[in-house]
Design a protein with these regions (language model features):
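Short amphipathic alpha-helical segment within the helicase RecA-like ATPase core
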Residues: 1-256
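A generic structural signal for tightly packed, nonpolar segments enriched in small/aliphatic residues
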Residues: 2, 59, 192-487
């Protein structure tokens, strides 16, 4: 559970700071300390900057801490109005991290500047404090981690109680919690049980297409991957959020590979490490659905989660097989470690049959996207130029940055097969992120579609607003897309 937020319109004073144990001081950017007014303990900050040989405006990138007279600690930073949302979130994350390292039960946020500056600073600081206050999964016996119970804000009072910040933070936290669970605690069986609990708690309609049902339906692409698991507990899970009066329906599709060995084309130990996080796309879809539900968005949402594992064994699919997908297309298997596009093919086609106004899928799909972008951006593809424009704008506003890639038809011949309708991938791997998107496009029935290849699902040291290595990237972006969607 995220902490409560208590708001005070008045600026923080010396008395409140003396009573606080952990304070985040968010100042407007200024080149000189003398330009700042009505800020308690400013002389302490001045001395700390002098000791570090820092200029005041360096606080816009590198926060510092000072001890307070009554035993508390203050983290000082400056927020630049002209910086990007990503840059603003990044400095706030660094400032909050200096406080959360001590596991405080309460954090005080103090914002300064004119009314416009304080409102922006409060909005961003509350979000960053919320998103970094939850205790994430850990199984250390001797280390008890306390989560933040209360956030107290001085300097601004919102009209809506920071509802958007709380909803997005809750959705992001859910995505990270699921992604970080060890693979013995999040098998497809466990995952499906957790999803059922979420569905009951949030009044979502829940339908499961289990292994036997999918096999009977002819979902050969999904079944090919799922059949390698002895338990045969894989499923496509369909969740529905249906507010009254909603005129649009959106499909969220997520890759949920709970562990990826690579199959017969077995990964090495180096590249198998961390493959319990290969279900991150489905967790992001769930996080967006949860946030949209909390915000009561007037959009119908169907989430389709492709939950399976990619195991090696006598029944596992192998190279050179020809598989028939749900839409009847035949697929030549080239590499068993390209399982994500296989499970997504049938899941996308199942989602497309409901004729949604927009389909958005999320997947940790290709290594080539990580090579192209690193772990600070995620890549997007679309069959509609207008959606790409909206997607990039949503990334700028949310602080979850995305970069678009081409889907030109002249990439298609690389997937030509002599024995099937399409190759799963190529052996040389050139432009695999683009070829994977071209492959998926075969299964969307020409519906408006956005595909996100989640190269930023994990970033060492955190990313933007989020301090953990697992970022939950895509939840804030997805909510921003839905809140401002134009179709």
């Amino acid at each position: 559970m995220l902490p409560e937020v208590i708001e005070n319109k008045q600026l923080i004073g010396v008395k409140q700071m003396q009573a606080a144990s952990h304070v985040l001081m968010v100042l407007p950017r200024a080149s000189k300390i003398d330009a700042l007014e009505k800020i308690p303990y400013l002389e302490i900050l001045r001395s700390a900057l002098k000791r570090r040989r820092m200029q005041p405006d360096e606080l816009a990138k590198s926060p510092i801490t000072t001890d307070l007279a009554q035993g508390g600690v203050a983290s000082w930073l400056m927020l630049d109005d002209g910086a990007s949302r990503f840059e603003q979130y990044s400095v706030l994350r660094k400032g909050i991290a200096l406080l959360t390292a001590e596991q405080p039960r309460e954090i005080v946020l103090a914002v300064f500047g004119d009314s416009k500056q304080r409102t922006l600073a409060a909005e961003l600081a509350v979000y960053v404090a919320l998103i970094n206050s939850a205790v994430l999964p850990s199984r250390k016996q001797k280390t008890k981690i306390e989560n933040v119970k209360k956030i107290v804000l001085y300097g601004d009072q919102s009209r809506h109680g920071h509802a958007v910040a709380r909803a997005v933070a809750e959705g992001n936290t859910l995505a990270r919690e699921l992604t970080m669970l060890p693979p013995n605690e999040l098998t497809p069986t466990h995952y499906r049980a957790q999803v059922k609990k979420l569905a009951r708690a949030n009044d979502w309609k829940n339908e499961e297409f289990d292994f036997k049902r999918l096999k009977k339906m002819g979902a050969g692409a999904f079944v090919a991957v799922a059949r390698g698991s002895h338990e045969q507990d894989a499923a496509i899970v369909h969740l529905s959020y249906s507010p009254k009066g909603a005129k649009q329906r959106i499909a969220l599709v997520g890759k949920g590979i709970c562990f990826d060995t690579g199959g017969h084309n077995l990964k090495s130990a180096k590249y198998m490490q961390g493959m319990h996080e290969d279900m991150n796309g489905s967790a992001v879809a769930l996080g967006i659905l949860l946030a949209a539900t909390r915000l009561k968005l007037n959009i119908g949402i169907d989430a389709w989660l492709a939950i399976a594992q990619n195991h090696i064994g006598p029944l596992a699919y192998k190279q050179n097989e020809v598989i028939t997908a749900l839409n009847g297309a035949t697929i030549e298997v080239v590499h068993t470690d390209a399982e994500g596009r296989m499970v997504l093919a049938d899941t996308l086609n199942l989602a497309a049959r409901a004729k949604p106004d927009l389909m958005m899928d999320f997947a940790t799909l290709t290594g080539s996207m990580a090579v192209a972008l690193g772990s600070r951006y995620s890549g997007i593809f679309s069959n509609r130029e207008t959606l790409l424009t909206q997607a990039i704008a949503a990334g700028t506003r949310s602080g979850e940055r995305v970069n678009s890639f081409p889907l030109d038809a002249d990439y298609e011949p690389a997937l030509d097969s002599k024995i099937a309708d399409i190759k799963q991938c190529t052996m040389d791997g050139e432009a695999d992120h683009i070829l994977a998107a071209r492959f998926l496009m075969r299964f969307i029935e020409q519906r408006p579609w956005l595909h996100m290849d989640l190269s930023a699902s994990s970033c060492e040291g955190g990313l933007g607003a989020v301090a953990s290595n697992v970022t939950g990237f895509g939840v804030a972006w997805g909510v921003e897309m839905l809140r401002n969607l134009k179709l």
